C-alpha cells in the first residue's frame, strides 16, 4: 500500500468535513427506476438510507419511478416511517421491468413518479442511488439542474458520456488511457472489420454486465449480438482480455486502493456481482507498487478525460503479460453490502456511513 498517496486521501477526507452542514440535513435517497439494475439500486438505496439515518439526518428512500402518491407528501421528512420495509434482496436474475411499469399505466407521460420532483425540491440534497440507464445517462441530473435540486455524483454531461461505452472508449484512446481494441455496431449494420475470437459483445449503454456476452465462434457471436441488441440499438464488440479483473474508485479526483475481483465460476456477470459468495474480492489487490501506482494513475486520468466530478469507479482488466486496460467508468458506483467502493474505502479506515457522508460533502462543496 502506498502510504503517502493514501495519507493525502485521508487528509482530504478530514478536510471535506469542514464543508459539512452544521444542521442535520433533509436527504432524499433516490433509487429504483425501470432499468435492469432496479433491484441493485434499491438495495444500494436501503444501505445508504440506514447509514444516513444513523448519522441523525432526516432521510427518505424514494423510488424515482413509483414516487409517493399520498396527499401528505409535503410532510414526508417529519414522518416516522421505515422507508426500507418494501425493499427485498437482489435476485440472481434481472428484475421484471414490465411488471414494475404495470404499476403505473401513465408512465410514458412522465418518467418521474408522483411528487418525486416536489419532494426532492424540499431536500437539502438528493443522494443518487440509481444505477443503469435511467440514473446514469444524465437525463435526471439535467432535470434536477433545471429544477434547482442538488444531488450527489457527477453532472449530466459526464454522465451521458460515460453511459455510452463507445464514446468512452474514444475518449480513453484520445486521453492516453489503455482500453481494449474494439468496434461499435448498430442494429442492422455489417461490421467493416471483425474483432478476433474470443471477443466480448456489450450493449452500448448498460451496466452490471447486463447485455454483456462472450463469443468464441460464429454461432456464439450471432447469439451474443442477439442478446446485446435486446438492451440497446448499438453494441460494442471488443477484444477479450484474459486475465485478472480490478476496480479502482476515484473520489474527488484521487484513486482509492485497488480491489481485485475473481469470480468463482464464469466471469463477473450480474449474478456474480450481487450474490454473496459468488466472487473472491481482495483489497488492496496483490500487485507490485509500480503496477499499483500505474493503474491508479490511469484511473485518475480516465476520471479527467471523461470530465467526471466528485466520484466514480473505473473497471480494469490485466492480461497475462501484465498489461492493463480500462473497460469503463461507473458514474454511480454500487453501494450494496457487497459493493466495491465501500470495500476500498474501508481499507483507508473510512467506514460505510462515513463514506456516504463524504460523498455528500464533496458533492455539496461548491454550494
Locations of the language-model features?
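Phosphate-binding site of ATP-dependent enzymes
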Residues: 216-297, 318-325
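Hydrophobic beta-strand scaffold residues
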Residues: 59, 150-151, 179, 199, ...
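ATP-binding N-terminal substructure of ATP-dependent carboxylate-amine bond-forming enzymes
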Residues: 5-8, 12, 18-157, 161-163, ...
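Glycine-rich phosphate/pyrophosphate-binding beta-alpha loops
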Residues: 132, 209, 264, 330-343
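Active-site "cap" helix and flanking loop/linker of ATP-utilizing ligase/carboxylase catalytic domains
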Residues: 260-312, 343-367
Amino acid at each position: 500500500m502506498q502510504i503517502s498517496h493514501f495519507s493525502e486521501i485521508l487528509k482530504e477526507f478530514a478536510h471535506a468535513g469542514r464543508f459539512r452542514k452544521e444542521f442535520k440535513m433533509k436527504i432524499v435517497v433516490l433509487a429504483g427506476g425501470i432499468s435492469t439494475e432496479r433491484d441493485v439500486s434499491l438495495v444500494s438505496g436501503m444501505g445508504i438510507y440506514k447509514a444516513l439515518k444513523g448519522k441523525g439526518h432526516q432521510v427518505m428512500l424514494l423510488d424515482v419511478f413509483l414516487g409517493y402518491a399520498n396527499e401528505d407528501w409535503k410532510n414526508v421528512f417529519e414522518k416516522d416511517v421505515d422507508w426500507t420495509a418494501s425493499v427485498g434482496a437482489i435476485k440472481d436474475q434481472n428484475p421484471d421491468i414490465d411488471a414494475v411499469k404495470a404499476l403505473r399505466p401513465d408512465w410514458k407521460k412522465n418518467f418521474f413518479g408522483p411528487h418525486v420532483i416536489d419532494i426532492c425540491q424540499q431536500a437539502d440534497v438528493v443522494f443518487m442511488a440509481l444505477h443503469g440507464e435511467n440514473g446514469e445517462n444524465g437525463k435526471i441530473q439535467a432535470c434536477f439542474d433545471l429544477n434547482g435540486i442538488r444531488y450527489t455524483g457527477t453532472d449530466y454531461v459526464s454522465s451521458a458520456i460515460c453511459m455510452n461505452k463507445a464514446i468512452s472508449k474514444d475518449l480513453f484512446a484520445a486521453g492516453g488511457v489503455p482500453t481494449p481494441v474494439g468496434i461499435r455496431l448498430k442494429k442492422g449494420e455489417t461490421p467493416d472489420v471483425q474483432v478476433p475470437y474470443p471477443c466480448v459483445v456489450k450493449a452500448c449503454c448498460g451496466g452490471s454486465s447486463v447485455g454483456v456476452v462472450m463469443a468464441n465462434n460464429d454461432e456464439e457471436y450471432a447469439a451474443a449480438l442477439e442478446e446485446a441488441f435486446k438492451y440497446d440499438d448499438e453494441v460494442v464488440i471488443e477484444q477479450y482480455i484474459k486475465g485478472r479483473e480490478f476496480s479502482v474508485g476515484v473520489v474527488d479526483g484521487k484513486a482509492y486502493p485497488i480491489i481485485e475481483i475473481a469470480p468463482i465460476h464464469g466471469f463477473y456477470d450480474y449474478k456474480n456481482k450481487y450474490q454473496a459468495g459468488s466472487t473472491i474480492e481482495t483489497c488492496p489487490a496483490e500487485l507490485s507498487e509500480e503496477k499499483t501506482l500505474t493503474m491508479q494513475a490511469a484511473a485518475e486520468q480516465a476520471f479527467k478525460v471523461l470530465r467526471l466530478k466528485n466520484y466514480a469507479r473505473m473497471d480494469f482488466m490485466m492480461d497475462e503479460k501484465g498489461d492493463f486496460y480500462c473497460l469503463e467508468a461507473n458514474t454511480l458506483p454500487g453501494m450494496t453490502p457487497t459493493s466495491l467502493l465501500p470495500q476500498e474505502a474501508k481499507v483507508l479506515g473510512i467506514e460505510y456511513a462515513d463514506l456516504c457522508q463524504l460523498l455528500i460533502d464533496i458533492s455539496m462543496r461548491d454550494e
